Amino acid sequence: MILQRALWATVFFLVFSPDAMSQIRPPNYDESLVPKFGLPHVLEGPDGKRIASPEAWPGQREYLLTILATQEYGIAPREPVDVTLEKIDDGDYASGDGVDQSIRRRQYAVTLARNGRSVRIDLLVWSPRAPAKQVGCFLGLNFRGNQSTSDDPNVRITTSWCDARHPGVVNNRATEASRGSQEERWPIRAIVGSGYAVATAHYGDIDPDYDDGFENGVHALFPEFRCSIEHPDRWGTIATWAWGLSRLADALEQIEHIDAARLMVVGHSRLGKTALWAGANDVRFKLVVSNNSGCGGAALSKRCYGESVAAINRSFPHWFNRNFRAYNDAEETMPFDQHQLIAAIAPRPVYIASASLDRWADPRGELLSGHHASPAYELFGKEGLAATSLPEVNRSIGGSIGYHLREGEHDLLSYDWQQFIAFARKHGL
């Protein structure tokens, strides 16, 4: 018993001490220094046996999700909340180029309520003005508030927490100066002109992006269900944002012109990690898009290239659950990796987008994650991602697992959206 207590004390110190969080190795950008590593096969269960039929997939998928939830993202509450939708604006798209009557702007207040507490999320939806039938919808969170995604003066300025480093943000609150500051990431005309709707909400409406001990945002709806030393497997902020995306899917199902059978989730960077986790858990998302999601997203952690587990846990200790810290500078001990996250989306299509200059996100690690997830798709007779070497820039490859390496930096640009739209069409969405 004394030995067991001593061992537990040692593990506790290694995982949770400030020194352990600060003493991390520098990033590796040399392929020759990538360690040799093994990956668990995506069809291999806890008994070491591989499933061989689509009928066995639901159980295997649940096994993968359980590993990822308990060891990385955190377990989210399963208790439902009341989701109500109130339309607060309905008009035409207005921009510096004038009013575009072919694009309809609608803004909704989505209220999540439980046990006398409530949280409001502002949902912005752009769609064709007069579609002949219900339309498919891309759903994604934004970083700076809905007003940052368009220069339309009618879009409400977010009142929730914003990162003070962003332009037009004062004392962690958005101002008019932030309007349209990220409209290049949301090419509304191109998306709606392709026949789709696009919906977005500010990630800060769901949970503010700082280490607050899980007190704010939708965590306030579940005060008894916080990640802590006593409960290290509970939801971190990425799992919280993903849970919020599912609640927004609940809301979109209530909008008459949205085809609830054609919901697609998309995200960039940390919100790409979020989109993957949301898509893996919620089968209502018929297509999942990860853009430059990197460590904790599409990139294989065991490659130890670019951002490491230790680096991400040190910089963003709230993103993942506390158990994930056990793998700081110890990726070789991980009994899982991100290819299992991609596989958990099967047989639904998933698209992984990288950028050529985004070494921090490890483009090759993102590609290889898709490659090693492919057996889950092949189980259903679908093509996955055969490539193990990066393709030439600005070329889309793959089957039900799509991939491209866009030329340029860590960003979400019109080229990326062009590929996402083409991929959606390819898969009949």
What is the role of each PLM region?
Residues 267-277:
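Glycine-rich nucleophile elbow surrounding the catalytic serine of serine-hydrolase chemistry
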